[in-house]
């Protein structure tokens, strides 16, 4: 499907990554393969390093950390945006939605449209399209689009095929109406025929008994 949106623009983009960094060479000992074969895979795939959370850091922690930074630095006001979209495949809980968790933890206004989208690889594009559609509403001036995942807990460190691909992190894009902005074109297609290749268990990141601590992302 082809999309075209006019009078929309990205006002800013922030990324949030954990400080904990691991290299493929450091993790090779976990893989049940001869080092020579793993090194060949590293060369073919271009594996180098990835960022992983420590402790019980969850998706909402990364989102809260990033938004709080924007507030504290004066780059975004708490009341500047009217919709919050969180795109994630690793929500804190089955319910409530992670977007509502973020809204509550930051004490954002109640008149804020909160929406979760369960998407992975196409998540930024899907979230962007949804943000553009929301901006059709007169009441919505800006949208905060958060793409975040903490997937390292869902993949075994011994899985040589998947673990090197996994990283934890978040991005926050601020999208707004802008008169005279060039047309933004997008194309999106879906194929769920091989869904079994991406199936994951239904575990959530944070149990009901766990209360999020004041945000300290490392």
Where are these regions (language model features)?
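Conserved catalytic cysteine-centered active-site region
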Residues: 38-44, 48-60, 89-143
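Short amphipathic alpha-helical face segments that pack within enzyme cores
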Residues: 61-66, 126-130, 165, 169
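Flexible, glycine-rich active-site loops centered on histidine and acidic residues
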Residues: 136-170
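Phosphate/pyrophosphate-binding loops at sites that engage ATP/ADP/AMP, CoA/4′-phosphopantetheine
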Residues: 66-82
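Condensing-enzyme catalytic core mediating Claisen C-C bond formation in acyl metabolism
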Residues: 1-56, 159-218
């Amino acid at each position: 499907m082809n999309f075209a949106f006019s009078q929309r623009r990205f006002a800013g983009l922030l990324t949030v990554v954990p400080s904990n960094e691991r290299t493929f060479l450091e993790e090779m000992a976990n893989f049940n393969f001869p080092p020579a074969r793993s090194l060949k895979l590293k060369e073919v795939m271009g594996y180098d390093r990835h960022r992983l959370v420590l402790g019980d850091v969850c998706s909402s922690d990364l989102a809260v950390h990033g938004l709080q930074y924007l507030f504290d630095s004066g780059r975004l006001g708490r009341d500047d945006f009217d919709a919050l979209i969180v795109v994630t495949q690793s929500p804190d809980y089955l319910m409530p939605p992670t977007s509502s968790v973020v809204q509550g933890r930051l004490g954002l206004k109640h008149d804020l449209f909160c929406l979760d989208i369960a998407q992975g690889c196409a998540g930024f594009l899907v979230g962007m399209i949804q943000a553009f559609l929301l901006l059709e509403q007169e009441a919505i001036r800006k949208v905060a689009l958060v793409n975040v995942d903490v997937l390292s807990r869902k993949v075994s460190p011994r899985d040589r095929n998947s673990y090197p691909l996994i990283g934890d992190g978040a991005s926050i894009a601020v999208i707004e109406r802008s008169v005279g902005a060039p047309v933004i074109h997008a194309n999106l297609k879906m194929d769920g025929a091989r869904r079994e290749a991406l199936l994951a268990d239904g575990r959530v990141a944070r149990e009901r008994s766990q209360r999020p601590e004041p945000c300290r992302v490392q």
